[in-house]
Amino acid sequence: MRARWLMMAAALGVAACSGEGGDPDAGAPAQDTGVLADSGVDSGVDAGSPADAGSPDSGDVDDAGPSDTGVDAGLPPLGPVTIDLTSNRPPDLLSTMNLFRIVDGRFEYNDRVVPYDLSTPLFSDYASKARALYVPEGASIQYTESGALDLPVGSVLIKTFLFGEDLRLPQEELHPVETRLLVRYADEWRAFPYVWNKGGTDAVYFVRGEVRTLAFIDPRGVSRTAQYLIPQKNQCLECHERKDADDRRFTTPIGPQARQLNWDVDFGAGPENQLQHLADAGMLSGLPPLGQVPTAFPWASLATTGTTALAYEAVTEAARDYLDMNCAHCHRPDATQGMTSRLWLNYDNTDTFHLGYCKEPGSAGSASAGRQYDIVPGDAEASILVYRTETEVVGDMMPLLGRSVADDVAVGIVRGWVDGLPPESCGN
């Protein structure tokens, strides 16, 4: 068996939400104010070792790359991956599918389960994420230049969310909180959410969702308290649902785009391009020369460059890619919020009005905090988009789901982009 290992601080996986039309078991998320990384769910499995953290220097712990140590812990091999596409309900225990296990603070992935990292990741209250994808034997991903890569039936996208009490420490223990699976059925993508037990040894299928109060020190040394949302299954549609040209609804992954994977990470034998790695493994077809593949802004580079030293061109790229990954799943022409608000934040939108320049909001209401336009070029303070990106006021903050505290690094980037735009006098 080829085992793949990953430090817990690595950012691996993709958004995991469902194309199903609702789950009768999923109600409003419950409130849980228990201790950090206590799932409130116990599978009865004996507790094992917690996870180790990596370096969070960039201001967002979701930024490290995968690695493959080749370590053999002396455990029996994982059994074959088991994905039952005939059932609408997954196994009660995540371990039943044999996608991965956590040993001595590391992820061990099964054959044809490959960790990956996003160039510009989604921010989720500073949670670290372990991302991976599974492709069945004999099948391969089809390259697409824009949007998510086309994964074959039977594929699984895996994203595990992890937290620690002090995110400044390179070896701070991280604890798995939840794992979201996105499974490719013949007719749609379906989501299966799991919550980890107290010992971090297994995760239980859990569709109702809950809110946890988590106290931690962020990578900049700021003490924070997040109202961390483990979403219920039905909430997935709020981010992942789109409409096609015939107005039919469908669900799509968000993260694993070619432009987000076109950069080097360490799989254990030195830096490798992630797309090339998949192609060399026979798991990706149609890959053009890498020089022809678009590339998203390398968010991890901010750990060394910081934000103040960036040229304005780089600030613009970083801001547009951040908005694309964190906002454009809703704010785009083929998503419900984009259709309603007419604010399109996808990175390839070149229409400045629909990007928000001097555009009055369609439905912001009191969330505009007295501001009149989505973006006032040259004036971040007067721009609704900047306010909603940085505020922590419930009902005003954006995105609506997935964060309760501000991403200070991203706020600085977005502010710098708007302030640097050629000034316009909106309304005149």
Annotate each language-model stretch with its function.
Residues 122-124, 128-138, 143-321:
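Extended surface/linker regions that mediate inter-domain or inter-protein docking
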Residues 83-86, 319-320, 324:
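Long, charged, low-complexity terminal extensions
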Residues 14-78:
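Ser/Thr-rich, Pro/Gly/Ala-heavy low-complexity intrinsically disordered linkers and tails
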Residues 20, 242, 333:
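Cys/His-rich metal-chelating microdomains
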Residues 263-320, 328-335, 341-428:
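Electron-transfer interface patches adjacent to heme c in soluble/periplasmic c-type cytochromes
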Residues 64, 69-133:
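N-terminal pre-domain segments of enzymes
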Residues 17-18, 239, 323, 385, ...:
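Residue-level detector of buried hydrophobic side-chain packing
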Residues 1-15:
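Sec-dependent bacterial lipoprotein signal peptides
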